[in-house]
Amino acid sequence: MEKTIIYFPKGCVIGRFVKRYKRFFVNVLVDGEEVVAHTNNTGSMLGLLNSGTPVLLSPALNPTRKLQWTLELVWTGGTYPDENKLPSFPNKEGGVTPFHSGLGFWVGVNTLIPHKFFKLAFEAGLFPWTKGYSICNTETKIGMSRLDICLHGNGVPRLWVECKNVTLVENNVALFPDAVSLRGLKHLQELKKIIDSGERAATFYCVQRKDGKFFGPAASIDPQYTEMFWKVKKRGVEIYPYHIDITTKGLSLGPILPLLSE
């Protein structure tokens, strides 16, 4: 049985996505009332944010926070099992928005999850490639950048890990990024410098959807990132794309995905 690494807080609600605006705001219909939630995902969330789609929101732990909800999960790929429990969502023709037939699933879109997930999974000893490391520092500055994870151990070089959230899948291939990412490109360049200095560097891709069977960079979306991805891999940067199992209770670590060839 897989161990749950991250649990969602009590008080989560499921509603219907209405719209996204000003990049960080989403409107969601919950119990017949439209609420405003925060999304920290700066990507496009390509193919996910369709009007009427079920979404899961988590409540703010700080009662004084301006926006009391955070977008955590988006349903995709098929009919939601408790469709009749959600508020009806009229479409432009006046009917109710239909959903795809087939088996649907949740997609995790909270971009704060990957580095938190990595730290907890590391502390639980779930990554064979981190054997020999005992200390996990987060948000460590190096050069002009700040990387998610820096691992330390006795007699081993430091291991720097940058964590990325993956929500895009095409033809069973999980792809990153889902929009041009200059920040992601900068991180790859920083990882290359780390390798050149004699330390270890890796990327942890948190694939938060079940239909990704392989992993690769999104060449059609960000060719610069893709070129740098293959360059740093050849240089020695380690690539670890992991499938993350998702339920409305929480997240657990699945298998590592095969990497497509260049």
UniProtKB/Swiss-Prot annotation:
UniProt xrefs under HAMAP family: SfsA
Native source species: Lawsonia intracellularis (strain PHE/MN1-00)
Domain of life: Bacteria
Annotated family: Belongs to the SfsA family.
InterPro entries, alphabetized: SfsA, SfsA_C, SfsA_N
GO molecular function, one term: DNA binding
UniProt cross-references to Gene3D superfamilies, sorted A to Z: 2.40.50.580, 3.40.1350.60
Signal peptide coordinates: none
Name under which the protein is recorded: Sugar fermentation stimulation protein homolog
